[in-house]
């Protein structure tokens, strides 16, 4: 007799913080799924989990509602505060998260402020030995740019900008992770408050240009009023009253440029860019007063996407590097490690006279001298569609530093191909299946700043946090990772050893940064990379005999690790003949606790079963597994609509499986370990269509009792 399924319907609140990795495993394995192809998949997966099924949107003001609800719980149940629950941070201490924002105090280079796109604003006053998060827990967690007012007497004033709208950790490149405007610190970075004129109050719905930020900078020359510039979605803005009000000096509110950038010279001259695709106001611009801008766009460049600016420290000269749409745009072709083409451009502009147009400015296209034709595809310049871009000119040497996935330095400003050296990112000569990272550095460059007192010294920020060098120069640049304690990692999953109570080992699936393992409860214990990619669901076998480790889109391995967490061997075990598009972006898996020898995994709308995982040889074979997988005969049909399996749970003693879908429904499979697996639907008619089943927990003593968690907002 079918019994009514008892439900616990809850709201899952997902907090995001970015992360990556030190290269300390004996070998690294690159997950060869195409990064650009996966962006839409990640976006759809995140949206499915959170949207209100009734409206198809994430509700306005939902973060403030969450905090208010939490305060109500604490008020109504004082035991939540008094019962003595103690939470211990487990890190990762040694893994810095994705960082776009970096600023160095002009008075003290040991005072550094930096920001993660979803990790908040952090500060160090001892050069990176210790870090402290200075943004409030209930403040918007995103930070894409930080600037200090450089004028004497005003240097305790700092500004930050939120809102990454390309390549976000929450939803994939090209998707909005909306900000909520700019923030101000009046106490030298110790505390931050929103700038009201830029705050929309609705960071989950796009209502203002200020929600998509690219850069905020302060002019060093205005003696009377603070002069700020912001590059946002669609516009360049200027404020002369510490951000109380803003004037749009470039751009518009319709047919807007998606990408923009702004930079200010020491004499107050302003350079700006607005991307060209579908934009009515677009181009490269220069302004002597920050109000009146002249279009100086070079005639040889026909179209462009994101373009970032690097100014010469003493001359009125600017470099621009960025992504262009095609081979006819004016740039050059390059390829990523999979051979996928993209097009990039590197331009130099020298101001001569007048308003900078015509003979008043000289343009050079130096794109052909970028390192786009190296023998190893990992060594080539790759901006990943404009996700990682930076260019800087080193004071005193005129060396030009550019960044994509890797970091490069050219001693002749890229006037030739002959004088360029890779000084960061991936290890030189990396290939698919055998790759590493440049010693103490990290791929995916977002910015680099030079020391004002010693231009050979520099700080670099990337998807792996913050690095410092005392000698930025061609050749073997020595980097120091100063991200220790800069805890900004984002986890998709955490796996414990369920067969050994209180075991300290944790295996985590990290956003964009693979699967890390740690062996100690100590906060400062080092986490080690196992398999790279977007870390997903994992499993630890009894006595840690083997591990099941997965990355995005169902890419699954069986691995053997030593007692230090190093990967000794591995093999791929996801089924052959299944296209990656069928999987959830972060695809669940479960091992039957009855014998620990059967792996279950959703394959889109079907459930797969792999028997005999204990005896499956770990032989280094990285081809998908043939023949051994079995699947449910019937496709899951939920509420008369084809649905995907989003989660599953296996009972502790009866081989019973429950699966949930992205369209509210839950199914039960009896005796799933043998014969055909038949799904029996359980009643969920009281729930709205579209509810995302995030997790299921089975009562260990009675498999007729389960808890089901829906992660969507407003499902109750």
Map each language-model feature to its residues.
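Beta-propeller blade termini and top-face loops
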Residues: 23-716
